[in-house]
């Protein structure tokens, strides 16, 4: 579960960078 959350967090960060 913790790993899943970490992966989701990373994907969100990438999405944010994409917006920039």
From Swiss-Prot:
Its EC number is 1.13.11.1. Belongs to the intradiol ring-cleavage dioxygenase family. This is Catechol 1,2-dioxygenase. The keyword Oxidoreductase applies. Pathway: Aromatic compound metabolism; beta-ketoadipate pathway; 5-oxo-4,5-dihydro-2-furylacetate from catechol: step 1/3. The lineage of its organism: Bacteria, Pseudomonadati, Pseudomonadota, Gammaproteobacteria, Moraxellales. It catalyses: catechol + O2 = cis,cis-muconate + 2 H(+). GO terms for biological process: beta-ketoadipate pathway. One of its GO terms (molecular function) is catechol 1,2-dioxygenase activity. Homodimer which dissociates into active monomeric subunits at high ionic strengths. It is an enzyme of class 1 (oxidoreductase). Its cofactor is Fe(3+). It comes from the Bacteria. Binds 1 Fe(3+) ion per subunit. Keywords: Aromatic hydrocarbons catabolism, Dioxygenase, Iron, Oxidoreductase.
């Amino acid at each position: 579960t913790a790993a899943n959350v970490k992966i989701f967090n990373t994907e969100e960060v990438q999405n944010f960078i994409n917006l920039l």
